[in-house]
Amino acid sequence: MTTKKFRMEDVGLSKLKVEKNPKDVKQTEWKSVLPNEVYRVARESGTETPHTGGFNDHFEKGRYVCLCCGSELFNSDAKFWAGCGWPAFSESVGQDANIVRIVDRSHGMHRTEVRCKTCDAHLGHVFNDGPKETTGERYCINSVCMAFEKKD
């Protein structure tokens, strides 16, 4: 089963009744505006099931933004097929302008987690096994954490 491809109008922050700094939004507020699976992955640091994300096989031209707050994360030009089960990107927008990297030693592994710098949503992980002809990095991102805006 493939999950929905979220669009700009699905961004959670835009559904709140008041304007707020995304870091000041309470978990109960996020839970009230985000679908259950998005909340579980983005706000509770979960992982969507591999090969089920709506953007795994999605290669239209445009940009990907954080589904919680709308911050720009990736351009479609950086997307590539990695076969890992999640959307893969070789670089983020503005050299991690809207992304924070955090050492993740959970589940007996040593990885680098990536989170949204604006709202602290868990996005996925970045690995050093990406295309050598670009950055050598592979951002492995949960589809449910992103919305897509098509480029005309």
From Swiss-Prot:
PROSITE patterns: MSRB (PS51790). Pfam families: SelR (PF01641). One of its GO terms (biological process) is protein repair. Its cofactor is Zn(2+). Its EC number is 1.8.4.12. The active site is at 140 (nucleophile). It is an enzyme of class 1 (oxidoreductase). The keyword Zinc applies. Methionine-sulfoxide reductase that specifically reduces methionine (R)-sulfoxide back to methionine. While in many cases, methionine oxidation is the result of random oxidation following oxidative stress, methionine oxidation is also a post-translational modification that takes place on specific residue. This is Probable methionine-R-sulfoxide reductase B. It comes from Caenorhabditis elegans.
